[in-house]
């Protein structure tokens, strides 16, 4: 099939499949492969335009694949001011960002996709689609920035607000201006940028949309922002509970909340893994008539031939997961030091890809050296789950945020002890 053919399902995924391995990516790959009668388009949202290695071989029923960068390759702005009304643009952004206004979202979609002219006195010009630079590096963009800064965070550092605005609004307008594959249903695997793309596509293509959340996107982004050392709090509220001044960190959090509220309001179906997640979804506007639960599961027959290895030289604890901050691998390393005090010959295997966040991997290796755990902790890289499971006595999980981890279900097939810290 060609990219012009209509797919049955368009999967919209952010920062995940097929560039990143992990539980959600494996589930997505399985979901596509077990439905060979359906055709799938995949829109993989990435942070920037730099090429990435595809870690999964795309199934044969994938008819269209495209990567969508939030920050396209920078180009010199076109000559002439784009004929975008900065006041309308800024007010729409303010209402979308500050109040998750659905009408403002519609206005932004129109601005992103409506051909425009340019102010070129005495020179011929033609109407054309706006460039990404028109949305973040033009006179109308400057007007819109100032409207948002004054309304949303007047006390915050202006330079910090500028960069937050440029990053977040640039991402939003990339999503809203990107070409759309044709599909009967648009299925986002989170809220965030993926959720916005899915509900926009469904509206424009007169199709249906669904959102499936394993972890709750807004919670995970809030954790990322709280841990971020590139954000500096410049408004010191002390212990004041009712201080309503907003710092730039608050702007980031509010934008991600608005993404979710708009996506929930417009989606036809919202599914998640278990009931506790629905509490968070309801808090951001999801309705009971939209919501359902589909728990995680594994195919037990695939694990039937595995037998725990007996008489190993050392008792073995394993953590299976990506080496990224939200998995809190450093906490696993600290736990390994405690375990070694009780079981001196224990081996702790940290099993998973190390290339997603190289600086965090280096920090983890330094922590192993600091705690003198070189003979206890071993980073194995990615391994086949069926090969490693029989060697594990205990499965350890230290994630800050997890929904219903597949690795614990898989560990249960070997009757390995499972634990979370």
Regions found by a protein language model. Name each.
Residues 1-152:
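N-terminal subdomain of nucleotide-sugar transferases
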Residues 400:
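Aromatic "clamp/platform" in nucleotide-sugar-dependent glycosyltransferases that forms part
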Residues 241-246, 361-382:
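Nucleotide-activated donor-binding/catalytic signature segment of Leloir-type glycosyltransferases, i.e.
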Residues 347-366:
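Glycosyltransferase donor-sugar binding loop
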Residues 276, 297:
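Carbohydrate-associated surface elements
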Residues 405-410:
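Short glycine/serine-rich donor-binding loops of glycosyltransferases
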Residues 261-265, 381-392, 413:
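Short acidic alpha-helix that forms the nucleotide-activated donor recognition element
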Residues 302-338, 349:
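Conserved donor-binding/catalytic core segment of Leloir-type glycosyltransferases
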